[in-house]
């Protein structure tokens, strides 16, 4: 069964480049970004993990932890990290899971479809994960899922933007419009009546339509 937003993120234990972890305990009171890549020592993955290393401080500012995953053993991850630093100019400073038995990949549906049949008999020797992303909240619930094909590198600035939106809307009864970024105007949630909105936003709001109430981003 596929995982959906608001499902509890399945817990697991796994070997990583920073030691064995229990996923829920590792998250603690933080947010988490779990992302898979197809294979170590491959070009697109090298650019992705290098860029994530560069922007990791931005996630830390937001109380969010990063953790990567592929079917490769942690020993390969450690060797590959040197190539990433050399070519991308950033040292991988977050743990990477060595999911050699595909346990986490199957748990999080990170494997591509197989025609015909299913993924039941797959082994790490013959399979690779697609480019999946899961944002998990401190409540251990899934807040976002994204899946990219193996041939397309992800836009991790977009993951950061979505995290900003998720954290903002968890705190305030607002929604973020198309192409929103930190500091832009937001939309008052439909669940907030006009009377409630007058109390929350005494300065008022713009409303080109009654259902489209635009206000400055709350602090």
Residue ranges with predicted function:
Residues 1-219:
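Chalcogenol-based redox active-site neighborhoods
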């Amino acid at each position: 069964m596929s995982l959906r937003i608001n499902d509890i993120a399945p817990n697991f234990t796994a070997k990583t480049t920073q030691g064995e972890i229990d996923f829920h305990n590792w998250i603690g009171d933080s947010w988490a970004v779990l992302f898979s890549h197809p294979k170590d020592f491959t070009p697109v993955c090298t650019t992705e993990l290098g860029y994530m290393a560069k922007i990791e401080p931005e996630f830390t500012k937001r109380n969010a932890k990063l953790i990567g995953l592929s079917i490769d053993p942690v020993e390969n991850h450690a060797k590959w990290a040197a190539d990433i630093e050399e070519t991308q100019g950033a040292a991988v400073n977050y743990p990477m899971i060595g999911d050699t038995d595909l346990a986490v990949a199957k748990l999080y549906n990170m494997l591509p479809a197989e025609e015909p049949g299913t993924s039941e008999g797959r082994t790490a020797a013959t399979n690779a994960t697609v480019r999946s992303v899961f944002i998990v909240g401190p409540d251990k619930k899934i807040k976002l899922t994204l899946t990219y094909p193996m041939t397309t590198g992800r836009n991790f600035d977009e993951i950061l933007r979505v995290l900003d939106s998720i954290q903002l809307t968890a705190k305030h009864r607002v929604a973020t419009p198309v192409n929103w970024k930190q500091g832009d105007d937001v939309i008052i949630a439909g669940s907030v009546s006009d009377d409630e909105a007058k109390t929350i936003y005494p300065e008022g709001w713009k409303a080109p339509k009654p259902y489209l109430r635009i206000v400055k981003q709350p602090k």
